[in-house]
């Protein structure tokens, strides 16, 4: 993808995949640069906003993460968007907002089981962000 970027630096698909690869490698700050570039190249680019939201969350930039998740929710939200926005609200200490967003994620998933499957995949990042392990079942009981 880097070679494609060298040849066509404005190729949005390459920019997206480079950002995604960097995020998968845990290079969130560098990935953010690519997602911001994609947001600049394509206006109202929800997939750029998703990348910015997640990388910002992992990088402890919670206000920035919430800003982008709120933009997504105003446009074309998926269940994962509500869930990730819920994660951000939770680590920011807004339990009521988090529970509401998780509730919307459950509705968007179609079943509680599908939501729980997605949610449990994010337990490690939640713990790294300061959510206590014993609080996870308590949050799930609220839903």
Residue ranges, per PLM feature:
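Terminal, low-structured helical/coil segments at or just beyond the last alpha-helical repeat
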Residues: 109-143
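TPR/TPR-like (Sel1-like) alpha-helical repeat modules
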Residues: 74-77, 87-114, 140-143
């Amino acid at each position: 993808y880097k070679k494609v970027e060298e040849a066509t630096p404005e190729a949005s698909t390459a920019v997206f995949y480079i950002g995604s690869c960097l995020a998968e490698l845990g290079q969130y700050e560098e990935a953010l640069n690519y997602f911001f570039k994609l947001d600049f190249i394509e206006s109202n680019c929800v997939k750029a906003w998703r990348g910015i939201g997640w990388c910002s969350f992992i990088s402890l930039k919670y206000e920035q993460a919430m800003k982008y998740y709120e933009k997504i929710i105003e446009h074309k939200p998926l269940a994962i968007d509500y869930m990730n926005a819920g994660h951000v609200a939770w680590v920011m200490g807004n339990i009521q907002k988090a529970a509401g967003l998780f509730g919307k994620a459950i509705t968007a998933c179609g079943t509680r089981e599908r939501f729980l499957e997605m949610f449990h995949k994010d337990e490690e990042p939640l713990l790294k962000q300061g959510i206590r392990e014993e609080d996870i079942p308590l949050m799930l009981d609220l839903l």
